[in-house]
Amino acid sequence: MMQDLRLILIIVGAIAIIALLVHGFWTSRKERSSMFRDRPLKRMKSKRDDDSYDEDVEDDEGVGEVRVHRVNHAPANAQEHEAARPSPQHQYQPPYASAQPRQPIQQPPEAQVPPQHAPRPAQPMQQPAYQPQPEQPLQQPVSPQVAPAPQPVHSAPQPAQQAFQPAEPVAAPQPEPVAEPAPVMDKPKRKEAVIIMNVAAHHGSELNGELLLNSIQQAGFIFGDMNIYHRHLSPDGSGPALFSLANMVKPGTFDPEMKDFTTPGVTIFMQVPSYGDELQNFKLMLQSAQHIADEVGGVVLDDQRRMMTPQKLREYQDIIREVKDANA
């Protein structure tokens, strides 16, 4: 892609250079042709001036009346030449100075009128102002032929080089995020946890208090601290508590007189680490929950109050092992 862009820029620069050269040659040839066209006019004009000069010389040697007639005719011709075309480059000094001293001798005082018009032929002295004009166009086409030619050649590759620069650092940081999952392996181990199960009635129903009380007592729970039931190491209530049972409804307490009591469910929980073997205590806790659910017609749920599954039971066992390893 970048090679194609570079080739296009080179072709465009070459076309621009060729166009500038053709334009320079065309302008120079046009100005030369205009100069050649003006030369025949200048030659004809110079011939006319020479003829007028010869006539002036002949008039100076002739009669005064003829000279007066020629003087009046000469300024009109000079004004026409100045308005139509630039005057010739030849500068002639009219020989009127030699003719002026003869005027008071040959002519009467009335012939002194022509000297008032005689200074008009001196106007061709201002004509040299037009002489440098045809020479100036010859120097103008020289500058555009040389100066603009190297500019597109050097400026074309610069944007192409700048376009490559931002593309290189983009690919460098891509492989870096691959090494980030390493800190995940260093999770701190749990030193304590709480395993929770629920025994709940079916949707739209509640557990009967009298049936619930009989099933709790058959599972080995005894009413005790915090007004909840506890399962101790011994069925008679002696020894440390292994796990406990509370009401699912806040504040979670029970009334020993449960004949008229109803509840949507109960919660069984065990704190790890606990007395004895935590995995054996977990199995006893699961058996107690299944016994109560069978007696009251409920179901066993996990800590999220979802149906208990074998995967969730293995997750509980993994948590217990992790806590045991952390406290070993």
Curated annotation (Swiss-Prot):
Provide the alphabetized UniProt keywords. Cell cycle, Cell division, Cell inner membrane, Cell membrane, Membrane, Transmembrane, Transmembrane helix
Q: Which SMART domains match?
A: ZipA_C
Q: Which Gene3D superfamilies match?
A: ZipA, C-terminal FtsZ-binding domain
Localization in the cell: Cell inner membrane
Pfam families with a match to the protein in the record:
ZipA_C
Organism name: Shigella sonnei (strain Ss046)
Question: Could you tell me the membrane topology recorded for this protein?
Answer: Single-pass type I membrane protein
User: What superkingdom does the record give?
Assistant: Bacteria
Asked if the record carries the keyword Glycosyltransferase, the reply is: no
- Which Gene Ontology CC terms are recorded? cell division site; plasma membrane
Q: Taking the first listed entry, what is the main subcellular location of this protein, grouped into a coarse class?
A: membrane
Family per UniProt? Belongs to the ZipA family.
The function of this protein is: Essential cell division protein that stabilizes the FtsZ protofilaments by cross-linking them and that serves as a cytoplasmic membrane anchor for the Z ring. Also required for the recruitment to the septal ring of downstream cell division proteins.
User: Which ranges of this chain reside in the Periplasmic compartment per its record?
Assistant: 1-6
Q: Which segments does the topology annotation call Cytoplasmic?
A: 28-328
Subunit and partners:
Interacts with FtsZ via their C-terminal domains.
- One GO BP annotation here? division septum assembly
Which intervals of the chain are annotated as region Disordered? 42-186
What spans are recorded as compositionally biased (Acidic residues)? Answer: 51-63
Protein name as it appears in the record: Cell division protein ZipA
Matching PANTHER family, A to Z?
A: CELL DIVISION PROTEIN ZIPA
Q: Does the keyword Magnesium apply?
A: no
**What residue intervals traverse the membrane?**
7-27
Q: What is the lineage of its organism?
A: Bacteria, Pseudomonadati, Pseudomonadota, Gammaproteobacteria, Enterobacterales
Record-linked InterPro entries: Cell_div_ZipA, ZipA_FtsZ-bd_C, ZipA_FtsZ-bd_C_sf
